[in-house]
Amino acid sequence: MSASINNVINVTLLEEGRAAARDNINVCAILTSQTGVLSTAERWRSYKSASAVEQDWGASSVTAAFANVFFGTSPNPVSAGGTLIVGYWNAAGETLPATSGVLRGGEISQAVVLPALREKSDWSFSIEIDGTKHDVTEINGMTATTLADVIAQIQAKITPDVASVVFDGSRIAITNKSTGTNSVVGYPTVLDGGSFIGDLLAVAEGSGASLVNGSASTEISPETQLESLSKLKAQVNVKGAAFIDKILDAQVPLIASWAKANAVIVYETFTGSAALEVDPTNPAWAVTLASQSNFRMLYSKTGNRKFGVSYMARTHTVNFNGERTAITLHLKTMNVPAESYEQTEIDKAKRVGLDIYTTIKDVPCVLSSGANDFVDNVYNLMAYVDAVQTDSFNLLKTTPIKVPQTYYGVDQLEDCVEKTTHGFVKAGVFNPGTWTLPDFFGDRDMFLRNIEQNGYYVLAGDLKDQSTADRQERKSPVVQVAVKNAGAVHSADIIINFNK
């Protein structure tokens, strides 16, 4: 035989590691207290269309009505790769029904088990259900064409009013028909006479099977709106959220603080004249005073809470990979009726930090207040921070070797941040301009020149200035970034000189 080429040439393939995806900034949640579909056991479902919501909740349900507003807003998050999450708020408490005892078999393959079953016609076992012994005999495997044929024979012996016997494609489950703490299913045992089938079907003790006893009905106490948000966020990474029900005044400061800490934008619609007042007892004004900009506040004179859902849907529509895709909500059209406001109400709403939906020259439009910052600033920066963090992580993660702790390695990290930031310049979030803050880092002239020419400046610290401890911990020098916001024109003063 000829000699192996490995005697001369050896090749090692260094594959690229799997990268992490950026957060989907356009995943939005509507939280409902409507029961019957979701519960504390199933807290959320995702939807891409209004019809899917109607199918689950009913066309005349309040949840479907709010979802129709969400999907009827154009564009909406689905058009930008997002989705609607309907989350559950356990507002009134919940009664969990009693459960049944169940025997869950180990995983089996029909292709492996069926040939063995066909060798005998006298399979048997004995099983106790609620303390009563049930003998299962004369299971004929020789006539079985599928495993379902054997399951049907077992079910005929253990009648359906006692327990159900089901094969789900990978394992067998025997579920007691009774419920409560006394609902018990035991492991199958060997029966005198016949061939024991328990091990072959992986339902015997020691075969990978497990027992779960039934439980009594359980009362679950009501939860706060903050608790429901927190539990939803733990299960699905929502970036926008709005409640169908009014957020209680006492919950507003708690949720506003939570939203900032958890990178979620919460949308709430206020109503009533008190919400327009500059008063510490006004929860909307208190949010503005605390600069809790992740809590977006809207005002509806008629108390139309669907305004918040449409506003959320219109906000979360940006694809930051595109060019000039960034938006402002000012003057945008919502999927709710516009309302009439006096100038005094408009001025008060603007001061407090409430956006309203009205008409100008019979054209419906949003009037935005920047008192608690503008929603696009919050949304854009949330996306940018995640992008920088994720892209920098991927630089370290995907290399099959390493990013060295050298000037070359630090330059790689610096270049990565610059590339990400440039993408947000392209999208219209940042833009070249004049730096108006007194703060700067590095060489001042270079700093200002980069801001004016590029809209950003990225600078990594010098390795020679790094502490021994950081060096030994394999940390990179600090990377600093300055970005110039592109902003948006919301109003203008025009002077006309007329010569007669």
Language model segments and positions:
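Polar low-complexity, Ser/Thr/Gly/Ala/Asp/Asn-rich disordered segments used for subunit assembly
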Residues: 1-29, 34-123, 129-130, 139-305, ...
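Structured, hydrophobic secondary-structure cores that serve as assembly/anchoring elements
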Residues: 1-64, 68, 75-81, 367-500
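Short glycine-rich loop/turn motifs
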Residues: 122-124, 478-479
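Short strand-coil-strand connectors
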Residues: 128-132, 486
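Short, isolated positions in well-ordered beta-strands
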Residues: 134-136
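Short, surface-exposed charged micro-motifs
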Residues: 162-164, 348, 355, 480
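A glycine- and small-residue-enriched flexible loop/hinge signal that marks low-structured segments
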Residues: 229-401, 413, 432-456
